Amino acid sequence: MSPNKRILRAVYLSLFFIGIFMLLDDFLFSRKASSFMNEEIKFDLNKDFDIDNSLIDEDFTFNLSDNSEDINVDTDIYHATFATFGGNLISLKLKNHLNLDKKPTEIVKVHPQNQSLFYITLDKLSKSLFLYEQIDSHVHDFKTNVEVNGKYYEYIKRYTFSKSNEYLIKLEIFLNNIDVNDDIGIDFYKFVLNSGIEELSAKGKLQYNNYLSHAIYYDTKLRYGKDGLNIANPKWVGAGTKYFEVLVSKENMKVEFKHENKVLNAFILNKLDNKNVSDVFYIYAGPRDNKYLDIFNQRELNSFGLSNVEFGMSVEKSLLYFLQVPMQLIMQIFYNVIPNWGLSIMFLTIVVRILIFPLTFKSFRATAELSKLQPKMKEIQVKFKSDPKRLNEEMGKLYREEGVNPIGGCFPILLQLPVFFALYGLVNNFFVLRGASFIPGWIDDLSIGDSIYYFGYKVFAWTDIRILPFIMMITQLLSTIVSSNVSFKSLGSQQKFLYFGMPIMFFFILYDMPSGLLIYWITTNIFTILQQYYIKMNLSERRNK
């Protein structure tokens, strides 16, 4: 095989691995909602001591629901809506994070079966609506009286919002004995968290690969929930999508996952061993971004005085995280100078290409050195064509005498794969790229594909007419042609497919990929074209000297 064809195959072998990587990544992450874990920590769960259904008047409950009023609370970052029925949070919108319809992202919304994202099983004891009281601009109480076994209790839910615009809500549960200083008669109650967060519009469902998942963090391990899983004393439990999540933390909690109405719920069991109840839940509801999550690991960084909560562990780290950290830092530096994330991706790409230029130059030089040996190689091939063993021996001898490595041009190309995979993971999951515009009217969101026309439905699995995939395909073809010295006439059918078929194949693979990733790829292709012209000129000048 000629050295140029060997290099060409190495290039497309790299592209093949890239395509497989992206397809597997998309497939595996889309199945997060059904992920399973084998390791379980069991604890004794006696359900007979939960809220007795005989204490619940279902007809009365329906009447209360019909008469419920909405209470709206606004902070700088949240627009929250509570219901006096149950005193529950029924809607939570993030003011600073818009969806594709340019409206605040609604991270919490009432479930279709009229079930809140999270609720307390003690709510079922209430036979009246909760009374709302605003303690101050950040603290809001919902109060009612409940009867348990002939004894009356004051039931209070206190929601405290951050004074420092942190994406955290403190929920305190109080159940105080009014009449008699006696046991409540209930062994435990449940905090129920379902997975129905971030309601997407029809367009959003087509554009975002918005997988849902329950996750739990315990014993320094991040795991995904499944029906029947029980965990004791986790750091937190939560539900999330690609970019947003709701995480719940509480001291000494026990969690059970169970399917109800075809929805996987997480039940936080809270033991009642006192005459009164006083429990505290910390609920993170916001972006899946370490910038907002990690402040709860150090007491001095958050207004709630929390430490070592480990919310940031919900953001999964890839094997190439050590490469992504400096890349993200470089992007941030460029963004601070020119506040455009699209340009930051382009500048990052140029920096990366400059850093790996020695590898690229070495690869091309190895190819050029092999090209010089073509006449001698052909002589050996003709002379020993009937003796494969002797042919290989003579070829090896020629390489040693000339000081040439026949695969020296392939390794530098393959060594660049980790860099691409790291960039892919960064661009595909970097939260700040969500909603970040590059060219208004064309590339309005770097986290999804570009669009010049939106169909409103799928046409052969496509939802939009996009331009970037066409540019990527053309520049990829030009880059491959410039990088090779092979004459088209000398190419066989297999090599011609590598030249023309692979870019077309990747056009379909990458069609719906985030525009930020395609900007990286296109910039790489253009830089490679210019780089190869420079290398050819440099080597030509050396030969002429």
UniProtKB/Swiss-Prot annotation:
Bilayer topology term: Multi-pass membrane protein
GO cellular component: plasma membrane
Family of this protein: Belongs to the OXA1/ALB3/YidC family. Type 1 subfamily.
Biological role: Required for the insertion and/or proper folding and/or complex formation of integral membrane proteins into the membrane. Involved in integration of membrane proteins that insert both dependently and independently of the Sec translocase complex, as well as at least some lipoproteins. Aids folding of multispanning membrane proteins.
TM segment ranges: 10-30, 319-339, 341-361, 407-427, 467-487, 502-522
InterPro entries xref list: Membr_insert_YidC (IPR019998), Membr_insert_YidC_N (IPR028053), YidC/ALB3/OXA1/COX18 (IPR001708), YidC/Oxa/ALB_C (IPR028055), YidC_ALB_C (IPR047196), YidC_periplasmic_sf (IPR038221)
Subunit organization: Interacts with the Sec translocase complex via SecD. Specifically interacts with transmembrane segments of nascent integral membrane proteins during membrane integration.
One Pfam entry name: 60KD_IMP
GO biological process, one term: protein transport
Protein name: Membrane protein insertase YidC
HAMAP family: YidC_type1 (MF_01810)
Residues in the signal sequence: none
Key word ATP-binding present: no
An annotated Gene Ontology molecular function: membrane insertase activity
Subcellular location field: Cell inner membrane
Gene designation per UniProt: yidC
Origin species: Borrelia recurrentis (strain A1)
The entry's keywords: Cell inner membrane, Cell membrane, Chaperone, Membrane, Protein transport, Transmembrane, Transmembrane helix, Transport
